[in-house]
């Protein structure tokens, strides 16, 4: 699994991405002191650790991730920080194994919004929440297709264009399905799934996050340190250097002697579970 290989470099290349997204998400869901929070797809703790500060000693924060090396590394960091209210465990983010009504807040940053069968996933999260509980998800603003996906001058589509579709269809059918239209769902699909699961006050906010790197090569290298690596690994090894060089040229030309930057459009979707009795 790609994410098993990422634990050592995930969110650690010097390009700030997961942490600023996490801070903004927490501002939106606003977990209060004393609440119990579940973070789905916790990775290296971008949401987990600042959430622990917000809920304080009277609350708890539980992180789950499907990648065992990620879980081990994040659990070790929680122990090093002396965070006794934080626990990290292996778990399937699409179907977390907790009793109903275990949490006041569920967050899933750059994870659940990308799951297939979002309506079913949203319904499972609703079951985990107590009445009036809050949910907050983040994901990419859905592009029409992966080939059209661009983070400003950083064209993810250039990597996707170098993938041989027939080879992917034979060996990675789930990823092959992403090569069609709306790989991350149609616009509004996440918000619609939350409403169908019984959430109210559902809001979707799109914001651009600027990515900065010391060099074009460093920014291209960042794409190997997160989920974008999935697409790189589908490119034949002898083609990767040429694709990377193309991306470096694009970024350098865009910078025109200034800072090397890209722009990641992030979708934040939040909601509140309808209180007991069904009255919003």
Curated annotation (Swiss-Prot):
The keyword Phosphoprotein does not apply. GO terms for biological process: antibiotic biosynthetic process; methylation. Transmembrane segments: none annotated. CDD domains: AdoMet_MTases. Disruption phenotype: Mutant loses the capability to produce nocamycin I and nocamycin II. Mutant produces a new nocamycin intermediate, 21-demethyl-nocamycin I, which was designated as nocamycin E. Its EC number is 2.1.1.351. The keyword S-adenosyl-L-methionine applies. It catalyses: nocamycin E + S-adenosyl-L-methionine = nocamycin I + S-adenosyl-L-homocysteine. Keywords: Antibiotic biosynthesis, Methyltransferase, S-adenosyl-L-methionine, Transferase. One of its GO terms (molecular function) is methyltransferase activity. Pathway: Antibiotic biosynthesis. Belongs to the methyltransferase superfamily. Involved in the biosynthesis of nocamycin I and nocamycin II. Catalyzes the methylation of nocamycin E to yield nocamycin I. This is Nocamycin O-methyltransferase. It comes from Saccharothrix syringae. The lineage of its organism: Bacteria, Bacillati, Actinomycetota, Actinomycetes, Pseudonocardiales.
